[in-house]
């Protein structure tokens, strides 16, 4: 994916500050021929997947041809994965870097509601998974057909905005339409493949990406069907770091704890519950065992603010993800040893659910990363302690009323000593990271299209090349991008080895 210097120079010269004038519009999509791909699954790597797709497009990342890329965002963000909503779409004409897709107009629908397991869930429903615990939603939404979004009153009826997206160190303008809240719901059963047409990429997802491999989710959710019934999965050999994010009042309290223990300077707790000292030198630490105490179903009942140094009887909010979330799977493994310690020796703990809430320990279950961040901000506004797990691709941009949360050290190791929020994970000092898995639907029931399979393969191969926050290649990937010293070798339950 790396561009030669001559290509970089040419790209910069051609770009200037002009907008993306050749954006692939809804009318051009409707005119066809158009290839459709639908990805679902993890919310954490949304931006990484988007940028990997963009790196395969004409006119981007040093590729030849005209830049006609554009994106449709459900919300008001700047690009997928950045306050964009749980459903987005993006499109472009593929370059020779995309192999068999070269020259094709491709629309990618990307849905991240519900988290990682929704890469597999539609296919489980279509394959007749019994679903005794109700974890399979049975339906999924995506942005409505892009070809329709240029009509009157639709989000792409007017002129597109633009976002400058950096690919391989060069900034490229990509056309953007916001507030594309026109969505369509597809339903999955043993007799219905999304809709009557049953088309991969439009009626049902072709596959997607998960924070952890299928077997982890299968055990966590008591799923009966094996992966071979659905398709195939490959280890991307790309690591993704996670961190514990807390509300400002809890951040200040943890600073007070560390100041009292002589770990932080005496001035580090001079801030307030609405404006703590957020300088790196004053970042406080949270012992992992305290997170375990509130995340564990069997101990959450005795938790209140005093666990973290606050007043007895005060409220603590555990802002966790829904069971199908890969981030929740990562949290379960790191703090509860579930499902990794479910063998004969036992030791795994059950995660606390919303139904386990008490008057002083309130557990909520969020369907996306954005929900966690919003709940942490709400807790700050209510002067309450709150904590949850968020992937390290996220960075708060606080205002007086929004995004008021921050990452803390875990067992005195910071997850974000560097701007890219991954240095300690890559070095091996910070071990809260796991490797992404790529799933492609197969078999005779709900297979991906050949074009989608090719795209998923291409994206999986380039994820490690992107210089993105919280994301890094492992040595097994053989990537030219930022690379860690250790690897889990595609097994989340295996300790990283160097």
Predicted regions and their residues:
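Flexible loop/hinge segments at secondary-structure junctions
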Residues: 24-498
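Classical Sec-dependent N-terminal signal peptides that target proteins to the secretory pathway
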Residues: 12-16
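N-terminal signal peptide c-region/cleavage motif recognized by signal peptidases
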Residues: 18-21
